[in-house]
A protein has these predicted regions:
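Pre-active-site segment of Zn-dependent metallo-hydrolases
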Residues: 11-13, 22-80, 84-91, 95-138
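Catalytic core of the metallo-beta-lactamase
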Residues: 2, 6, 16-22, 141-175
Length: 175
């Protein structure tokens, strides 16, 4: 098993995103938005994960810094499952819908400034349609119930105590 960090490392505390790769599967753990300023926000523009197979996404909790780049996966054509506890997925749905609305509104405001400065206009990071596409992929799994997250990857949520629905992921060898 190989684990790679895409976000929330190297001085960044937002943008939580890890790739777990085995011989059989490739899974993201969280897919969070970078927040904090122009430098941090610029990190949201590149692809969230290389254009390789992605079998599933596991969410540890619903905060934006753990879920906020999920709609980018929809823009990239991802249609696989996104697992989380029921409360995590409820929170993620609220946050992603609000974030999509804010992405569009903020982009419109920034594009007015760009237009006045003679700069090229940008698309919003994602739209409400992108958020809805990703929300259709959410798959709730309760605490303590073993599930097959991807080929060869079993998981169990345990209560992390961070917020309602937050979970640590156990990958037992004998589920």
């Amino acid at each position: 098993m190989k684990i790679s960090t895409i976000g929330a490392a190297g001085g960044e505390v937002t943008g939580s995103c890890y790739v777990v790769q085995t011989k059989q599967a490739r899974v993201l753990v969280d897919c969070g938005l970078f927040q904090g300023g122009k430098k941090s926000e610029a990190l949201n523009r590149p692809p969230t994960t290389p254009n390789r197979r992605l079998d599933a996404v596991l969410l540890t909790h619903g905060h934006l810094d753990h879920t906020g780049r999920l709609p980018l996966l929809a823009k990239m054509g991802y249609t696989g499952p996104i697992y989380g506890t029921p409360a995590t997925l409820d929170m993620a749905a609220l946050i992603l819908r609000d974030s999509a609305r804010l992405q569009v509104a903020d982009n419109e405001r920034k594009n007015l400034k760009r237009m006045r400065a003679g700069e090229s206009l940008q698309e919003p990071l994602y739209t409400p349609d992108d958020a809805e596409k990703i929300l259709a992929l959410l798959r709730p799994v309760p605490y303590q119930k073993p599930f097959d997250a991807a080929p060869g990857i079993k998981a169990i949520w345990t209560d992390a105590g961070h917020m309602l629905g937050s979970a640590s992921i156990q990958h037992p060898t004998n589920c």
